[in-house]
UniProtKB/Swiss-Prot annotation:
This is Pertussis toxin subunit 1 homolog. InterPro entries: Borpert_toxA (IPR003898). It comes from Bordetella bronchiseptica (strain ATCC BAA-588 / NCTC 13252 / RB50). Residues 1-34 form the signal peptide. The keyword rRNA-binding does not apply. One of its GO terms (cellular component) is extracellular region. The keyword Protein transport does not apply. Keywords: Signal. GO terms for molecular function: NAD+ poly-ADP-ribosyltransferase activity. It holds the Pfam family Pertussis_S1. Gene3D superfamilies: Heat-Labile Enterotoxin, subunit A. It comes from the Bacteria.
């Protein structure tokens, strides 16, 4: 597995070499796509449309620090007080993440720890002015507070990140439809069904072209985990997984990813 070997080799030769390469090659300004915010974003969730179409999505709490959200500190495995709901402008990434969760169910059944059945949902959401680009918001944070360690990887993050942060809530009226994916652990068959949301309100809107300006973190942010591919942050991804596990997931999905790991705060809890 190329990604896994690369990670292990990086650990042996020193991650500072990788950081030096990124510091030289990362763009010094935000990329052109940052000026063209998406009209549609996607979210993986385990909750059924009977709940989501009625209630929408609500953030954990009121912590609007972008860096703490992206590193997972304010998410479920941390303090569970993030003021953001994670979405992705990449449907493919969301599908890859769902496939990963489905594979987990299959492997658990093989190990005698489950039935192998799996149900997951991909929600298609109309973005509006309440959605902010994670990359541009990260740039804004670094520029405002002068986090030099973060600045080294800011260009790489801005280039490859596809997360959009909904502040506080995504109302049902913004949720266009859902794709339900069911894997039968007995037959091995996977079926996909799409359901429209009767409460959806069609409008011509896009995500906010401006970054979200957040307060400064009171925590000691010593590092982050950057995945060099379209990804979402730790609040949707599984930051508790090791880099090796995430590399294996990437290769199973057929997407070559380069993982750069430097003292991730996600592993400090």
């Amino acid at each position: 597995m190329r990604c896994t070997r690369a990670i292990r080799q990086t650990a042996r030769t020193g991650w500072l070499t990788w950081l030096a390469i990124l510091a030289v090659t990362a763009p010094v300004t935000s990329p052109a796509w940052a000026d063209d915010p998406p009209a549609t974003v996607y979210r993986y969730d385990s909750r059924p449309p009977e709940d989501v179409f009625q209630n929408g999505f609500t953030a954990w709490g009121n912590n609007d620090n972008v860096l703490e959200h992206l590193t997972g500190r304010s998410c479920q495995v941390g303090s569970s007080n993030s003021a953001f709901v994670s979405t992705s402008s990449s449907r493919r990434y969301t599908e890859v993440y769902l496939e990963h969760r489905m594979q987990e169910a299959v492997e658990a059944e093989r190990a005698g720890r489950g039935t192998g059945h799996f149900i997951g949902y991909i929600y298609e959401v109309r973005a509006d002015n309440n959605f902010y680009g994670a990359a541009s918001s990260y740039f804004e944070y670094v520029d405002t507070y002068g986090d030099n360690a973060g600045r080294i990887l800011a260009g790489a993050l801005a280039t490859y990140q596809s997360e959009y942060l909904a502040h506080r809530r995504i109302p049902p009226e913004n949720i266009r439809r859902v794709t339900r994916v069911y894997h039968n652990g007995i037959t091995g068959e996977t079926t996909t069904t799409e359901y429209p949301n009767a409460r959806y309100v069609s409008q011509q809107t896009r995500a906010n072209p401006n970054p979200y300006t957040s307060r400064r973190s009171v925590a000691s942010i010593v590092g982050t985990l950057v995945r060099m591919a379209p990804v979402t942050g730790a609040c949707m991804a599984r930051q508790a997984e090791s880099p090796e596990a995430m590399a294996a997931w990437s290769e199973r999905a057929g997407e070559a990813m380069v993982l750069v790991y430097y003292e991730s705060i996600a592993y400090s809890f």
